[in-house]
Amino acid sequence: MLSSTAILKASGDVAINYQQYIYPIIINKLSTLNYTIKNKKYYSQYKYSIQFQNEFQKNLKIYNNSNNNNNNNNNNKINKNNNNNNNNISKFFIQNNNIDKKVLRHFYSSTKLNYAKQQQQLFKNNETFNETVGASLLPIINKLQENAALIGSEITLPQIIVVGSQSSGKSSVLENLVGRDFLPRGSGLVTRRPLVLQLYQTTTTSRNNVNENEDEDEDDNYYDNDNDDNSLEEWGEFGHTGTNRFNFQEIKEEIERETERIAGPNKDISSEPIVLKIYSPKVVPLTLVDLPGLTRVAIEDQPPDIEEKIKSMIIDYISNPNSIILAITPANQDIVTSDALKLAQQVDPLGKRTIGVLTKLDLMDKGTDAIDILLGNSIPLSLGFVGVVNRSQQDINNRKPIEQMLADEWKWFDQHPVYHRITNQLGTKYLAQKCNKILTKHIRDTFPSVKNQIRQLIKKYESDLEKYGEPIPLRSAEKSRLLLDILNEFSRKYRADLDGTNEELILNEFNGGARIRYIFSKAFQSTTAAAATTSTDNSGGGEPFGWLSDQQLKIALRNSGSTMFIPQKIFDSLIRKQLERVREPLIQTSEIILDELIRILTQADYSHVLSRFPILKERIVEVSNNALRKLVKECNQSISQMVDAEMSFINTNHPNYLYQLNNLLFSSSSSSFVVPQGAFQSTSSTSSSPTSSSSSLPLPQNSNPYNDALNPYNIDRSYPIDNQIKQQQQQQQQQQQQSYQQQQQQQQKQQSGFLSRIFGSSSSPPSPPSPPQPKQQQSHEIQIQQQQQQQQQQHLKKQNLIFDDKFKLEQYGLNDITEDEKKQIYLLRRLLLAYNDIAQFNLQQNTMKLVSLLLIDKSKDILQKELIDSLYDQSSVDQLLRENELVVAKRNECIYKLDLLKKAKKSLSQSENSDLLHLY
């Protein structure tokens, strides 16, 4: 490979064979330039590459043809052309001598790299590598960006987010990238909505569909710097205006109008983006999102929390893991105070997706520079820093063309004593190419995740659309069929919930039939048991027959005519009273099940079907409730009849009852049988006695009477009793005993009870034998007590006193219950409890069966018929099928978003197979 000087020397020597010597060097040079462009090295050579290729493409074609043609005439023609082109080669190399040296030097160091095939293909297409990839991928992402703006923030697309404080030069950077003035300017907060800026590189001039309102006044000379035809090559389109084209002055005005329309006339902000597409042959394919500039102090017409609002908006955008952060910081301020870098570090602490941009490098104090920052020595960023020079306010006022500014920017960097060493890594053009390369690579890397997001969103909206259903048909026959289908489906799912055959699996709670079974097995049994086990104070929580005190049993025994046994009639009466107490809880069971059935009717499984038609839903619930309440009324009557049937026949021949009876007979027949300690209640106050005697024994705290003698009372018989009250009790006892004896003699002749089987059937029931006690063993205290009783009795007879209401029979304490009575009371209560268990079990089981048969099963059978008979009417179909407006709006939204997502998925699928995704 010859040096540049040798090339120049050879090109001036006509004796050198042009065909064999000069053209191979040109081919190598072209390959070098293409390789250089591909790697974005020596950015200053870019603008010469197309010129170089165009100048020698024709000659190369002649050269290639000459290799395949041995005709002497053609060779003579080529030699003649060679002589004519020598001058052009010399002129070109002389003008670009310095460029040529750099290019050839870079080519020498890269001879081992093999890019020949790729370079030749790029050369044939006359395109650079990055332009090809960017032009193919970015339009797809831009289209997705537009759809994402319409769909919402549900897709995390790869995009470059421009972040910076006010007056940081953010707007100037964007305008430099576009090469046009198009952003509104002014004091305070100007950018008040996100601006999605999509740059499309065009290659041909289009005169179609140009905005008819485009003005061609003197202002166009400012926006069209080169010639008047540029207005046809460059234009803008907004996402909210369709395909209408705008020139750059109109773009600025439309941004202001659209911002004020959404964000209001004051200085408030809005998160709804503006989508702007700019078509120009001068731009690099790129997508940027310009956000409002950070501010610290709210000015006039701004809300006081404007700073927090802007920060929150910026965080929402840069938190997207697929976004690239373009953090803009003015170089004439301390880098550690950069608001943009501070926010970027919050979401990207490692700096893997942050590009730092230093603006206003020309405004730094003399003797200072930002070379350490640009080289990454101060703040390390994986994507590095890029320095740029913006137009000054005077340049803007003087309408200095941006192309002239870009040339001045390059000249300033090239002549700077420090920055000239890294000129190829500075400037607006380098920033554009760097962003293009990073974004293009990022798009390729995030394609799978974006495609997966779109797939998931399609699945979600299809599911939502299925819930909202198809639009209502217009024909009457189709409407009637739809109504019938809804009623049938409603009834089917109701049956499925009760039977446990619902397709939807619920794991967080009992549902349908499982809840009903739980109510039967747990809640229902505990409720009826609590109603049957009422304590003596009628507060609940005691034992069965807790409402029946031992004193009442003693009185019942004595009222039966004997102190030794009780007739069957008294036993039956006590059992019936106990069964009557559970009648209401059993009836309430059907009401509990009714509430559960109503809950199932409005269950979430098919609530979405009814939510479409609020009138139909209301009527279905009304008809269903009426049908269920008819059933529950019949069910309650059957439950009440069942209780009456249980009370009508007290079956003392039940095997379980006989088993308990035999056990009691066996245990009580033993001579050593003793009534368990504490098996008797220590109070005579009952639910039937409104007052309690002052002589009754106190009830110990925390006592649980009659828990199978496991929790006995601690009876304190030493409780002091007033002497006068005691004397009155003794007098009452004597007179009452005489009355009882007379009644017993009469009743024993007429009645006999089941307890006679325990104590015999003689006219005088036997009492447990007790050894006679000699008189000398009786205590002197007892003798005195007997004498006092006799004296009091005689005194009462003389006074001809009668019993007052306060001397009621239930006021007798436990002291007057004999051992025989204790035994009888104990045995009687145990038999009552034994039969109560049998009766309670029968009632609970039969109640569950009646509720299942008459309410649950019957509701499954009649619900569909009731709904069709009541609602399937041709005259009311239109009214019943009137849709909820909210459902209609949501369905239309789903259809719209599904259409956008499916188009996006199609675009991604077509691009996924493109070789351009695999070139990097």
UniProtKB/Swiss-Prot annotation:
Keywords: Coiled coil, Cytoplasm, GTP-binding, Hydrolase, Nucleotide-binding. Residues 765-774 have a biased composition (Pro residues). It comes from the Eukaryota. GO terms for molecular function: GTP binding; GTPase activity; microtubule binding. GO terms for cellular component: cell leading edge; contractile vacuole; cytoplasm; membrane; microtubule; mitochondrial outer membrane; phagocytic vesicle; plasma membrane. Residues 164-171 are annotated as: G1 motif. Residues 212-236 have a biased composition (Acidic residues). Residues 825-916 form the GED domain. Residues 290-293 are annotated as: G3 motif. The keyword Coiled coil applies. Residues 681-705, 724-751, 775-790 have a biased composition (Low complexity). GTP binds at residues 164-172, 359-365, 390-393. Residues 724-751 form a coiled coil. Residues 65-84, 204-241, 680-790 are annotated as: Disordered. Gene3D superfamilies: Dynamin, middle domain (1.20.120.1240), P-loop containing nucleotide triphosphate hydrolases (3.40.50.300). Belongs to the TRAFAC class dynamin-like GTPase superfamily. Dynamin/Fzo/YdjA family. PANTHER family: DYNAMIN, DYNAMIN-B. Enzyme hydrolyzing GTP. This is Dynamin-B. The gene is dymB.
